[in-house]
A protein has these predicted regions:
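Auxiliary alpha/beta "docking" domains used to position bulky ligands
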Residues: 1-166
Length: 166
């Protein structure tokens, strides 16, 4: 999606918000070589442990078009899963366990995939474009794509951190 398609970008952002997404950005479906080099260093150091599939899918991970050669653009949506209250307040209650906020609700893979399917169907109907969706279960380095799209920064802990959403 280039400048000729600004109306589509605006539509994606508005439709994404209607589907419950907080943020939307668009970037090229390609990653700079430094991302592949970083993954290579990680794999060569053995940091992937017994997750052999990471090495087996290295090329697909670093080349988004390896899974779908027609891909030219990545549209990244973000959703804040934080609760309305401060989750740190629960730490004082010694009678109950505390788990990560992202794991407290329904499985986010299912929640987000359902929303994305709705959005993808509407985009395909509107434009005639082919659309594929991924919710961090495919060998796709979505966090570097999100950073490249301007949604935040990927930190040492590998999470994407955003100024607006943490």
């Amino acid at each position: 999606i280039d400048k000729r398609h600004n109306d589509i970008k605006d539509w994606l952002a508005a439709t994404g918000q209607a589907e419950g997404f907080d943020i939307c950005a668009v970037t090229a479906a390609e990653l700079p070589a430094i991302i592949g080099a970083g993954l290579d260093n990680y794999l060569q150091a053995g940091h992937h442990g017994d997750m052999g599939w990471m090495a087996e899918t290295r090329n697909r991970r670093t080349t988004p078009t390896a899974m779908w050669d027609a891909a030219r653009t990545a549209v990244i949506f973000g959703c804040n899963y934080g609760p309305d209250h401060d989750p740190m307040d629960n730490l004082a209650a010694k009678s109950s366990a505390n788990i990560s906020v992202y794991a407290r609700g329904r499985d986010y893979h299912n929640v987000l995939k359902g929303r994305l399917k709705q959005l993808a169907g509407r985009l395909a109907a509107r434009t005639g474009w082919q659309v594929k969706i991924f919710v961090d279960t495919a060998p796709l380095m979505e966090k570097p794509l999100a950073a490249q799209a301007g949604l935040g920064w990927q930190c040492k802990h590998t999470n994407l951190v955003s100024r607006g959403y943490g």
